[in-house]
Amino acid sequence: MEESLKWSKRRVLLLYTALFLVLTAGVFGRFIYYGKSLIGGADGLSQVGASMVYNGKYYREFFGNLLHGQFSPKVWDLSVGMGMDVTHILIWNPLQIICGMLFVENASLGVAVFTLTSLYLAGLAFLAYCRYTKCNSYAALVAVITYLFNGYILNYCIAQNVFIELYIILPLLLLGVEKLQKEKKSGLFIACVFYLGISLLLNLYTMTLILAGYLIVRYCCRNEKKSIKGFLKEIISPMISYCMAIGLAAVVFIPKIYLSVTSGRVGNAEIGNLLFYEKKYYADLITGLTGTNEIGIHGFIGISTLAVLSVFMLYTSKAEGRIKELKVWGVILALMALMPLGSYLSTGFLGFNHRFLFACIFYFSILIVVMLPKMLMAGIQQKKKVFAWTSIYLVALVLVSLWKKTSLSYMMAFLFLYMGCWLILQENKKYCLWVVLCIASAEVFSLAYTIYEPTQKGYISKFEDSKTVNKDIQIQASSIFKTIRDSSVYRVEDIVSNEKENNREANFGTRNGYSSLDGYYSYMYADIVNTVEDMGISQMGNPFNIYDLDERTALYTLGGVKYLSVYKEDITAMPYGYKLIKEKKVDDHGKKKTLQLYQNQYALPLMYTYSTYIPAKDYLKLNPCQKEQAMLQGVVLESTEAVPRKKPEFNSSNILVKEQIETQIKKQMAKKAKQEELQKLPLEVGTNGITCYETGMKLELQLPEDLEAGEYYLCIENLRYVPKNRIDFQEYYLQKEKTQYEKKVLLKKSRADSNENQRAKITTELQGIKKTAVLWGKDSQYDIGSRNLLFNFGYLDSKKGKLTITLNGRGEYTYSNIYVVRQPMDSYQKEYQELSKYIVKNVEIKNNRITGDIKVPDRRMLCIAIPYHKGFTAFVDGEKTKLEKANGMYMALPVEKGHHTIELEYNLPGQKVGLVVSGIMLMVIIVLQIREKRRKGAQKDEGYYKFNQIS
């Protein structure tokens, strides 16, 4: 039976291609039917679409310059983040580069072509591995269906298409190992590791873990006599090839290493329990094995039910040969999935998520390839064992579904179909396999229907409309900036009215080629992340997703923001000193709106001078509001002798202090308790903060009458959110009745609760202006500990006001201080005039260089509103000058009296060293290849000589 189904490569390729086309049409055809693109999810517009457009333009320019003999690739871009190196967004995937260049004007089509072609290549890679390891061709064809069309791919990778490359690289990497060990051919292995070295570092780390495990398990299971010496001999060749590949990739790998270690990407502030998850996670794991639900964070499996039978078939078979390897891997992956330690280990303890479950998909697919032929030759006793374990699994699934209060997935019907096929058609094995292939295909269609169909899970609603997606990537609000006739270098900002739009318009600058004070990149510079947290910026999705600087007047001016766009119909926080200069009628998703363009009347260029400085140690003692005002008076430095020290002066006033705010909250809660006859309040004020027993609690703060004009802030210092569930607060929920019935009802409701990776949202509103801040909970994926939070309501005229605070998140909110601030703008104009007296003119950015001219009457500190980074080198009149970190995340250098030419040059840190290492390694590989060819040639000649002698 094994030999009868060993097909030629051509036949397998034709059958696979036909099958892929049919399944792709059935699964993704509904996107065309419903008018949806393949750009969707939380990061679809801001990262997937933005990356396609940016890389398309970048590589068009790069290859265009190359054709004209100009080799000076851009490695730094002011539009990337707040001004960062392009490695944050640059991709090295050849297919994505081609798609980007071909479809730069139609990113939606480019993403679709890239995604579907990547899936096709992933299937080819899987089949190549199966063929080399002598798997049954038909079983491989059945398994490849499950490898490509599963819950992980359909729920996650379609929206985050960069992760599809893992499905291509993993089988090729393991195929490379087999070729290296069996044939001493290292080409494929080196190519895979090289690509991982220039790609995402996290992918390299994860694949290295899998590779290490593969080599260890391979040696232990395939060698009867085991020893340390034998193991070292087994892995020496892969280790050398691995190092050669990393050395070859050093020109990109070393700069990426520097980028990662100097970034603000954070994991948990406090690592929680490493051994056990909450009950809800294990319930999700059981149902998510063949279902569509998420497991933990970004974790999906949704494998074919045929894999369930294959698992039970595996563990009822004798542990010999490949069966033994698969059993060991099953235990390893089970432990990874069952323990939080596995999640931390898969990310190098830099985060907490379950993306590593893609490895389980590969495992289950290989399991089907190996076990399907054996199932068709199984005896009665083994069938009974498999069916017994299957029955236990089904009972567990039913119990968990009842516990979760969810319906049992009708995907289980396919499990019975597979079992029936196995029982009835086993004697006609070839016919049985054809039926299994049809069932597997139908199962894929059902899975896709469950996930995407609007009447089911409706995940397709998360994807952008195909008619408007390209315009949405560019962002409608940016269109008015094209009318600006201004040759100077400046930044722009787009003001939106709610958190949803903030998230949709993340990476605003990068998507339009404009410079702005935002950025959504996994490896944002640590100085940027630390500064925005220190300043209490509330408009952040997570520590490295900065929407903007919250429309704060001083921060915009100090950052070189000159123009703003805003919809007239939206109620937004407007900074002080901006003048309306243009209006434009636009169509925003079917709604007629008026787009407005404002110009900052107090705009500073990217480079301006200070005559005084404030020591960083003094600056750190100030509250977020004072820090903003201090930077208008003196540049913040560690220390300097270039300019005198300045003691900042403040004119802000706290119109409500902590005691007043907490008193008002207590009165509201007492009134609510009296009205609802509650013994225990839904929200309690303690000495260290607030305990919120119910989510969605709305608090109202009455501000003093006859407010004077100024910028208004709500500031909360050292805020920390500790999530709690209903069981934690059962005393509150059972205060009216404590019957067994009430307790059971509470228990049922609490099953949907989880304290893992929880986040709260604090929404504030003043005079119709709403601001929402995301607050990640203790031990969550992006927990950074306590932080300052400042909500800016913009510049408001003298009016009465009532400030509302809505706490969306059950748990404890601890803080050291809370107050409402009025910041008058009386001194702002004077401070601006002082800063704008001596500025750098004729600023130009070209070929990784920033140049400009300045004339000063005395010694001053020149502040450069570009994020500080080691890659910059400064020259004043051609002489190298030391750059200092200023104002938390910007740069500064001293300038003497007189006229000066300023030049900043950017080089990727580690690029020169990496170039040398890559060059040396390339020569080593070439020399080794030449020697190998000569050796083979000599062996061939020797064999020919001996043959002639015998003749």
Give names to the regions the model predicted.
Residues 45-68, 72, 90, 94, ...:
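Periplasmic/ER-lumenal interhelical loops and adjacent helix-loop junctions
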Residues 2-9, 51-52, 656-951:
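Active-site-proximal, structured, solvent-exposed surfaces of multi-pass membrane proteins
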Residues 25-33, 94-108, 138-160, 248-261, ...:
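Membrane-interface helix-loop junctions at the exits of transmembrane helices
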Residues 69, 77-88, 442-467, 482-558, ...:
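Extracytoplasmic/lumenal acceptor-recognition loop(s) of multi-pass membrane glycoenzymes
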Residues 98-99, 514-616, 620-629, 633-674, ...:
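A cross-kingdom signal targeting lumenal/periplasmic-facing segments of multi-pass membrane
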Residues 184, 324-341, 345-470, 764, ...:
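Contiguous transmembrane helix-bundle modules in multi-pass membrane proteins
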Residues 23-123, 145-167, 260-265, 273-298, ...:
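Membrane-interface coil-to-helix junctions
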Residues 16, 20-22, 115-132, 137-222, ...:
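Membrane-embedded helix bundles of polyisoprenyl
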